[in-house]
């Protein structure tokens, strides 16, 4: 069996303020065999140009009119997925560096896999980001 590929579906709409942090968190992953599929709902800000500026072949961007239904964006993204596993990441979220490696270890130990986990909620305040932990 070849190296496992993760397809990461990222719905976006006017996410220019957050999309860099989201994509940068993927570029920092300790496991590098992934593809990011950004599905943009015709943003009116710089979201699409920011995504395209990365110039990394693993990061793709497609447009959709999802009529405000984010599930349409996720389902559309799945049609482009080439990976062995599909992951969802919102454009205003980011992952810790070992996220995919941790998922891979679990996938290798279990035949049928659906992974979910807790999250940390961060809010921006005057002195930076603060966690709910």
List where the protein language model places each region.
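Nucleotide-sugar donor-binding/catalytic module of glycosyltransferases
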Residues: 1-133
């Amino acid at each position: 069996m070849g190296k496992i590929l993760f397809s990461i579906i990222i719905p976006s709409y006017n996410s220019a303020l957050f999309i860099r942090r989201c994509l940068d968190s993927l570029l920092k992953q300790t496991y590098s065999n992934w593809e990011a599929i950004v599905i943009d709902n015709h943003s009116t800000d710089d979201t699409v140009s920011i995504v395209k500026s990365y110039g990394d072949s693993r990061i793709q961007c497609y447009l959709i009119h999802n009529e405000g239904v984010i599930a349409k964006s996720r389902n559309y993204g799945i049609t482009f997925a080439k990976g062995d596993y599909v992951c969802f990441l919102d454009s205003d979220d980011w992952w810790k560096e070992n996220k995919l490696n941790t998922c891979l270890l679990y996938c290798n130990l279990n035949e049928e896999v659906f992974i979910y986990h807790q999250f940390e909620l961060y809010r921006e305040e005057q002195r930076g980001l603060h966690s709910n932990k």
